[in-house]
């Protein structure tokens, strides 16, 4: 329920600067620096694992993926030499002075 409330509030923000301010004021991300524009309307599943530096511009449609389940897929293909299904989770750190273009997918690691 809390996640839906956050996403609705992000939709109500006028622009990327407003969304970044909302994320910063409500301590939703792990870290968000100064002068950040966050244009996507979505958040990673584990938002606290996303860290944004100063002077960051994130275009619309960008997705941050903080987890993967490749072992899950391979295990059920009959390749039993892989470990049983495990959810792998990791942090994403975006440094200072970064621009991320539209519809990019950023993975952890």
Regions found by a protein language model. Name each.
Residues 19, 38-109:
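Flexible, glycine/small-residue-enriched loop-and-beta-strand segment within the central core
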Residues 1-29, 34, 62, 67-72:
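Terminal amphipathic alpha-helical/low-complexity segments used for targeting or macromolecular assembly
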